[in-house]
Amino acid sequence: MIISASTDYRAAAQRKLPPFLFHYADGGAYAEHTLRHNVSDLASIALRQRVLNNMSELSLSTRLFDETLSMPVALAPVGLTGMYARRGEVQAARAAAAHGIPFTMSTVSVCPIEEVAPAIDRPMWFQLYVLKDRGFMRNALERAKAAGVKTLVFTVDMPVPGARYRDAHSGMSGKNGPLRRVLQAMTHPEWAWDVGVMGRPHDLGNISKYRGNPTGLADYIGWLGNNFDPSISWKDLEWIREYWDGPMIIKGILDADDARDAVKFGADGIVVSNHGGRQLDGVLSSARALPAIADAVKGDLKILADSGIRSGLDVVRMIALGADTVLIGRAFLYALAVHGQAGVKNLLELFEKEMRVAMVLTGAKSISEITRDSLVRELGA
């Protein structure tokens, strides 16, 4: 199997994973228009090639919240990562730490905070949802701090779960879902042994630690469905600040007015994100939303972006549009599913190589030199 780009990992992951898991990661909301536009809008952005600039010295490193990153990339929070490889959160975190970038742990990870944090030699980030069960939120924050987490990623674009039609077709949800998942596992023996058997326990570790009992996939779906909180407002985030005094990033911003509100609230950063096209179909792609948001709040807080990033070239595009750092989700998850920690390591090396080529050929010797002047054409131009 030849792996030369993240798209190769996607194809290999589709062969290796049971369909319910592949499509859970790969799918989006409703008819998946936004999911597709996340990728196509980035691809339509033309870079400005510059030559003869003596690019013998090049630096991809950047600073973010008193951390030095080897490149402006972090691994995004992805629920159920531990179902894609044996103890997947640990493997992904180790690959990220070895490359000198942050790993963001999802609230709904398979491995608990206490298993992942000691496995790496740099602080990880922790992602938290807005939930009705404030006791769980408080418990998660306390455990994150105790584990040495410095940065909180607070996801605000899930007051209700998105309508993901693919999940019903694949067996992730819907009629006879449990039976279909078992049958699919039986026809994917490599995954069934490595993850299904050797990757146990299949609890949602952070939730099980709080509830005091094993929480499997069916419980995960039911518990989350009952705990999303549509009543959340900016005032509720003040409650979070009572329990978290470190850097806080608000994830799920697509509008400049919301970005300005994040500044007023005192957020340290935002993630320009449509949840990978998994929440509301028909909203702007992150690439389309980013320039106006950067114009509104650049310099007032750190701007991160995700959704649709499939290569180091896409990272350069997002930085040129106004991001300080990007998050990658599906790309690392596919690599993890195929080759575990080694796959994520290789993917990050591919991203770095692609970034270096793009920077050399656009004349940017450092991340700070990647600006809108690096673009020939922005979206809609």
From Swiss-Prot:
Entry membrane topology:
Peripheral membrane protein
For substrate, which residues are the binding ones?
Answer: Y24, Y129, R164, R278
According to the UniProt record, one GO cellular component term is: plasma membrane
Protein residues bound to FMN: 106, 127, 155, 251, 306-330
Q: What cofactor does this one take?
A: FMN
Q: Which Pfam families match?
A: FMN_dh
Q: From which residue to which does any coiled coil extend?
A: none
Question: Recorded GO terms, molecular function?
Answer: FMN binding; L-lactate dehydrogenase activity
What cystine linkages occur within this chain? none
The record lists the catalysed reaction(s) as: (S)-lactate + A = pyruvate + AH2
Q: Biological process (GO) annotations? A: aerobic respiration; lactate metabolic process
UniProt-annotated location(s): Cell inner membrane
SUPFAM superfamilies listed in its UniProt record: FMN-linked oxidoreductases (SSF51395)
Top EC class per UniProt?
Answer: oxidoreductase
Q: What is its main location?
A: membrane
User: Keywords for this entry?
Assistant: Cell inner membrane, Cell membrane, Flavoprotein, FMN, Membrane, Oxidoreductase
Q: Where is the FMN hydroxy acid dehydrogenase domain?
A: 1-380
EC annotation from Swiss-Prot or TrEMBL: 1.1.-.-
Tell me which family the UniProt entry assigns to this protein: Belongs to the FMN-dependent alpha-hydroxy acid dehydrogenase family.
Subunit field text: Homotetramer.
What function is annotated for this protein? Answer: Catalyzes the conversion of L-lactate to pyruvate. Is coupled to the respiratory chain.
PANTHER family registered for this protein in UniProt:
L-LACTATE DEHYDROGENASE (PTHR10578:SF85), S -2-HYDROXY-ACID OXIDASE-RELATED (PTHR10578)
NCBIfam families referenced in this protein's UniProt entry, alphabetically: L_lactate_LldD, PRK11197.1
Name this polypeptide is given: L-lactate dehydrogenase
Give the species this sequence originates from: Pseudomonas putida (strain GB-1)
By which gene is this protein encoded?
A: lldD
